[in-house]
Amino acid sequence: MSDFLPFSRPAMGAEELAAVKTVLDSGWITTGPKNQELEAAFCRLTGNQYAVAVSSATAGMHIALMALGIGEGDEVITPSMTWVSTLNMIVLLGATPVMVDVDRDTLMVTPEHIEAAITPQTKAIIPVHYAGAPADLDAIYALGERYGIPVIEDAAHATGTSYKGRHIGARGTAIFSFHAIKNITCAEGGIVVTDNPQFADKLRSLKFHGLGVDAWDRQSGGRAPQAEVLAPGYKYNLPDLNAAIALAQLQKLDALNARRAAIAAQYHQAMADLPFQPLSLPSWEHIHAWHLFIIRVDEARCSITRDALMASLKTKGIGTGLHFRAAHTQKYYRERFPTLTLPDTEWNSERICSLPLFPDMTESDFDRVITALHQIAGQ
């Protein structure tokens, strides 16, 4: 239908169009100066020393795990309540994902669940900053330091998120996403931030065939025209067309996230009169990026299942999302981990629903959603 309200829509404007035109006019459309500008700008946002732009956050996770030497016989701890790409990358490297439960109300992985899963084979911990809120980094990094295990923050939802006064990523290594539904987007893309120069160098090589330099370095940096492969790598570089869009979006981040926060506040107020349960907020000091606004639809409380609610909203021209179906309940992982039970993850996975939330959402759009929820709830 022509007036269908999606659960997410990118906020694009004249600035993004102008940025693309500038790159097209320059004659250099693949990885080049706009990538360098984006990496520098993102370091200013997070406070990190190094940033490496990549073709997706999944690509960033892949090469980050590779740079840590993750492989056969290793274990990596991650929540099951996450997008499956993290699990897939662990498995594709020959390692074993150790999926742990989350807090029932915030959907954040807890230090208690992480510590219980640590073994001599544990080679990395991947906490997820879920829906735009931060995980408890003090406790998680303390575990990493105590056991000598690297922490890689999955910050795909967390551009603009802070924990105790510091932007996510400032503590170490984090991976952000520029996918089409994220707080800032360039259609597809991502970026890895770190303060470790050797780690950053490995990422740069792995993202571009395993070469020591990329094409722009060879053209503009006074480097030798022929580069050597240092180790087998991938083709995960971000074109400057995408980097230019991400830069334009980054300049709008504060305004975009402020609008998201305003809509989330309206949702919280409206939910007081509805049976649907929003996620709880973390108790520690933080700034929430409001990537998603998630409710839990418990049939005993709401007299409707989550799937039926989503179907009903769709008939009313309103889109929703599911973030996420727990990884360990999906066919591949279900068959390989048949005895794994994660009660709070499973309870939420069966009930969570993402409502429309994006910066260009109007008051009329918001009213449509709330009116529809009241109708479905029989109010």
Swiss-Prot record:
Q: Does the keyword Lipid biosynthesis apply?
A: yes
The residue range of the signal peptide is none
State whether keyword Transport applies. no
In terms of InterPro entries, this protein maps to: ArnB_NH2Trfase, DegT/StrS_aminotransferase, PyrdxlP-dep_Trfase, PyrdxlP-dep_Trfase_major, PyrdxlP-dep_Trfase_small
Keyword annotations for this protein?
Aminotransferase, Antibiotic resistance, Lipid A biosynthesis, Lipid biosynthesis, Lipid metabolism, Lipopolysaccharide biosynthesis, Pyridoxal phosphate, Transferase
Q: Which reaction does it catalyse?
A: UDP-4-amino-4-deoxy-beta-L-arabinose + 2-oxoglutarate = UDP-beta-L-threo-pentopyranos-4-ulose + L-glutamate
> From what superkingdom does this record's organism come?
Bacteria
**Would you name any one GO CC term?**
membrane
Q: What is its EC number?
A: 2.6.1.87
Co-factor requirement = pyridoxal 5'-phosphate
Q: Which Gene3D superfamilies match?
A: Aspartate Aminotransferase, domain 1 (3.90.1150.10), Type I PLP-dependent aspartate aminotransferase-like (Major domain) (3.40.640.10)
Any one of the GO BP annotations: lipopolysaccharide biosynthetic process
Where N6-(pyridoxal phosphate)lysine occurs, residue numbers?
Answer: K182
Annotated pathway: Nucleotide-sugar biosynthesis; UDP-4-deoxy-4-formamido-beta-L-arabinose biosynthesis; UDP-4-deoxy-4-formamido-beta-L-arabinose from UDP-alpha-D-glucuronate: step 2/3; Bacterial outer membrane biogenesis; lipopolysaccharide biosynthesis
User: What would be an example GO MF term here?
Assistant: pyridoxal phosphate binding
Biological role: Catalyzes the conversion of UDP-4-keto-arabinose (UDP-Ara4O) to UDP-4-amino-4-deoxy-L-arabinose (UDP-L-Ara4N). The modified arabinose is attached to lipid A and is required for resistance to polymyxin and cationic antimicrobial peptides.
Give the NCBIfam families listed for this entry.
PRK11658.1 (NF008658)
Q: Which HAMAP family match?
A: ArnB_transfer
Can you tell me which family this protein belongs to?
Belongs to the DegT/DnrJ/EryC1 family. ArnB subfamily.
Q: How does it assemble?
A: Homodimer.
Task: Tell me the protein's name.
Answer: UDP-4-amino-4-deoxy-L-arabinose--oxoglutarate aminotransferase
Lineage, uppermost ranks:
Bacteria, Pseudomonadati, Pseudomonadota, Gammaproteobacteria, Enterobacterales
